[in-house]
Regions:
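Catalytic active-site module of serine/aspartate enzymes centered on a nucleophile-bearing elbow/loop
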Residues: 223-267
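A short loop-to-beta-strand scaffold at the N-terminal edge of the catalytic core in hydrolase folds
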Residues: 2-11
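Flexible "cap/lid" loop of the alpha/beta hydrolase fold
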Residues: 97, 101, 107-137
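Conserved HGGG/HGGXW glycine-rich cap/lid loop of the alpha/beta-hydrolase fold
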Residues: 10-58
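Conserved alpha/beta-hydrolase catalytic His-Asp/Glu region
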Residues: 121-123, 138-192
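Gly/Ala-rich beta-loop-alpha elbow adjacent to hydrolase catalytic centers
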Residues: 88, 92, 96
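Conserved acidic catalytic loop of the alpha/beta-hydrolase fold
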Residues: 67-83
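Conserved loop-alpha-helix segment in the C-terminal half of the alpha/beta-hydrolase fold
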Residues: 198-232
Length: 267
């Protein structure tokens, strides 16, 4: 595995460090809709581009969740972050679960926004064909976007999301990532993890629904929480940014509250 410092931007200067990982269809710009309203005094966010995306579009690699997790941990090392929380959207949810498995003692809290389970996401043959061909077929990407947001989003938004996806991802990497996040099962490596874990699901997302999270995320993490956002599909950063921020930051902030309680008990 070649060494790579993931391209990233830092936002905020708070004491609670957070690394946020994008999904299959976008680079770190996926988080642009929430940036203006984050609590940058309490948190410092590192938004990254995985290999094959954004500023790392031309980077070589195997384009697997394990490689992505190793890159995330290497970035934390480079930033000097011994302890940090993780956020991952969709495919990025699988990457951050891999990172938790690789460095469990370093992760404060983990958040999956419509996360792919650590068991992968087996697809029926027709859906697999739709997803696999999306690497070179913009119409397939648009169909996936439309289906996973309940068929309720305007054409202009769908078209813009497709353009962004095409511009900011390498087709070969895009296709290779699918094999990893959909086909690999590593849930035995995170099953029983004591790390507090939040899953955020969209009520309009038929693929990575609250029901699926109950059967996976909620079973594997003893300290799991699940929040379902109404009138929201797979892309909560675009569809419900303020609700997402409040949900995620309240969860992350509870880590400091828990530490305060522990300090009080020791006193």
């Amino acid at each position: 595995m070649t060494s790579l410092t993931l391209p990233h931007t830092l936002h905020g200067n708070g004491p609670h460090k957070v690394i946020a990982v994008h999904g299959w269809f976008a680079d770190r710009s996926a988080y642009d809709p929430v940036l203006a309203d984050l609590d940058l005094g309490s948190f410092q966010y590192a938004l990254v581009d995985l290999r094959g995306y954004g500023e790392a579009r031309d980077a070589e690699g195997t384009f697997t969740t394990a490689e992505g997790a190793a890159d995330v941990i290497a970035l934390a090392d480079r930033l000097g972050w011994d302890r940090f929380s993780l956020i991952g959207h969709s495919m990025g949810g699988s990457v951050v679960q891999r990172a938790l498995a690789a460095a469990p003692e370093r992760v404060r809290r983990i958040v999956g926004v419509s996360p792919v389970p650590a068991s992968g996401l087996p697809l029926p043959p027709d859906q697999w064909e739709l997803f696999a061909a999306a690497a070179h077929t913009p119409e397939n990407r648009r169909t996936i976007l439309d289906i996973t947001t309940g068929g309720r989003r305007p054409a202009g938004w769908l078209d813009r999301m497709v353009r962004r996806s095409l511009e900011r991802s390498d087709a070969k990497a895009f296709r290779a990532w699918l094999d990893s996040w959909a086909g690999e099962d590593f849930h035995d490596r995170i099953d029983g993890s004591p790390v507090p874990a939040l899953a955020v699901a969209g009520a309009l997302d038929p693929a990575l629904s609250a029901e699926l999270q109950r059967a996976t995320w909620m079973r594997w993490f003893p300290r799991a929480e699940l929040v379902e956002l109404p009138s929201c599909g797979h892309y909560a950063m675009d569809e419900a940014p303020l609700d997402l921020i409040r949900t995620v930051e309240d969860f992350l902030r509870a880590d400091a509250d828990a530490e305060d309680e522990d300090d009080g008990a020791k006193a």
